Amino acid sequence: MNDLIIKNNKKGSCDVIIKYKCKKSDENIKRRKSSHKYIKNKSVVLGRSIMTNKKEKLKGALKYKGSKKEIKICNKKSMIKNDKDENTTLKSMKSDNFKFSRRGFILSFTGNLEDFYNLSKEPLGKGTYGCVYKATDKLLKISRAVKVVSKKKLKNIPRFRQEIDIMKNLDHPNVVKLLETFEDSNQIYLVMELCTGGELFDKIVKKGCFVETFASFIMKQIFSVLNYLHIRNICHRDIKPENFLFYDMTPESLIKIIDFGLASYFTHNNYEMKTKAGTPYYVAPQVLTGSYNYKCDMWSSGVLFYILLCGYPPFFGESDHEILSMVKKGKYQFKGKEWNNISEEAKDLIKRCLTMDADKRICASEALQHPWFKKKKYAFNMDMKMDIHVLENFKNYGLLLKFQKLAMTIIAQQSNDYDVEKLKSTFLVLDEDGKGYITKEQLKKGLEKDGLKLPYNFDLLLDQIDSDGSGKIDYTEFIAAALDRKQLSKKLIYCAFRVFDVDNDGEITTAELAHILYNGNKKGNITQRDVNRVKRMIRDVDKNNDGKIDFHEFSEMMKLKF
């Protein structure tokens, strides 16, 4: 049986040595003058865990400094725990400047989609350039939605690729998630999360009109996602009920915006958009003149808001020509019995959305602060609180291996809303101003409000949660850090593994990990330092030292505790 020796050195630090018979050329531990130690050439940072072979019983910190020592030794691991150690580890991670974006995990493949998915015979919906089908992952049996677009019908393929690029950049609870794309000689396939609750349009047709409290629930989501888009200089240009889907059939289901086919990047406040795009009932007057800005979305949302409350549009006619003529005049009324019990605050917000002068028209961030939302607040999971387990998960996430953080981000991205229901609701409550992200101050405030004591190194933890270095906590970043790794299903772990395993051969190579890590995450060429970083990430979890990671090693990595 191999010996595990804990030995105090002259400087008062603690060395952990694995002792067994070996040749001089096969040293078990190589020492350096730093916080790093090595086991068989595997770099171990203070406070971290690594995968080891059968002869190596150690998983954890190799060096410890401080007067108080808490050393836990068992068959599988040796851990040295101390708040100062944890702080040192977080500081070393911050100095390493390891940052990445989730968009790099949305991969594009060439080949046959049906090698991986079974498509439904009947489409869920039809569009100008193709259809949307329900798709079932052949191996994992997970349901997705697949938009199948014919290249022959596409008038402008580069324009369509811009739609894909826009979707890759979006990370918001009210935006349908793009998961991966496929392309063959005839078609392009967009694999997205599946929404089963139907269109907002269908619900309006069925219901007729809605009470103000439910309308506020819908409009807050619409203004929130528009605020998110406009902050990123993206104009949707086709806001209408048909382009919002309910995630599921539950009464409190969120809505998701879809179809970015007409979306466009813009320069803030300039009237540089010229293309006449949109749908007659919802199109803004400036679009018809051929010179408009992002506030065309606010006009369209005002029309949608009007319809929610009464069941019919403010501008109507027997033909598109008549409808557009009414839009150009911009005249509408709040007459009819449907408006008798509608509040003045609701009417005021509609008026501010349907202001003819775009410069005076309300923007999404202003709309979210309108008094109507406070008066007609929809009580959607407003009692959602963060418990101590979420804070513990944040702390654990900060100490994860780089590879593990990548995997947790992919799992958060691949998870459906059912898997993260409570965390999603918590995120929405914390996002008080509806920007689609949480500031570090908002997260601190939310934790303290729920009676949780923040660790003294919380700012360092936040830097680790902010994986793309944007200075704020995006939706997927929050979910990735808050997820309980003990609750991860084998299916979700395999979902992440399969993203890394680009060629689908059952193993993750250095080249594949580099492709994932730097795909869309790095400007310029990959340097030797980047390559060395990836090699270290592989080495940290490569249990059998073959230079590759199989699913067993990957699964074991995801189970490591701290």
Swiss-Prot record:
One of its GO terms (biological process) is protein phosphorylation. The active site is at D238 (proton acceptor). It is found in: Cytoplasm. Ca(2+) 3 binds at D542, N544, D546, K548, E553. A motif (J domain autoinhibitory motif) lies at residues 393-401. Its main location: cytoplasm. Keywords: ATP-binding, Calcium, Cytoplasm, Developmental protein, Differentiation, Kinase, Magnesium, Metal-binding, Nucleotide-binding, Repeat, Serine/threonine-protein kinase, Transferase. It is an enzyme of class 2 (transferase). Residues 418-453, 453-487, 488-523, 529-562 form the EF-hand domain. ATP binds at L124, G125, K126, G127, T128, Y129, G130, C131, V132, K147. InterPro entries: CDPK_Ser/Thr_kinases, EF-hand-dom_pair, EF_Hand_1_Ca_BS, EF_hand_dom, Kinase-like_dom_sf, Prot_kinase_dom, Protein_kinase_ATP_BS, Ser/Thr_kinase_AS. Its EC number is 2.7.11.1. Residues 393-428 are annotated as: J domain. SMART domains: EFh, S_TKc. Ca(2+) 1 binds at D466, D468, S470, K472, E477. Activated by calcium. Upon calcium binding to the EF-hand domain 2, the C-terminus of the junction domain (J domain) undergoes a conformational change which results in the dissociation of the pseudo-substrate inhibitory motif from the catalytic domain. This, in turn, may facilitate the autophosphorylation of the activation loop at Thr-279, which leads to the kinase activation. Ca(2+) 2 binds at D501, D503, D505, E507, E512. It catalyses: L-seryl-[protein] + ATP = O-phospho-L-seryl-[protein] + ADP + H(+); L-threonyl-[protein] + ATP = O-phospho-L-threonyl-[protein] + ADP + H(+). One of its GO terms (cellular component) is cytoplasm. Residues 118-373 form the Protein kinase domain. PANTHER family: SERINE/THREONINE-PROTEIN KINASE. Calcium-dependent protein kinase which acts as a sensor and effector of intracellular Ca(2+) levels probably in part downstream of cGMP-activated PKG kinase. In the mosquito midgut, regulates the gliding motility of the ookinete which is essential for the ookinete to invade the midgut epithelium. However, another study showed that while required for ookinete invasion of the midgut epithelium, is not required for ookinete gliding motility. Belongs to the protein kinase superfamily. Ser/Thr protein kinase family. CDPK subfamily. This is Calcium-dependent protein kinase 3.
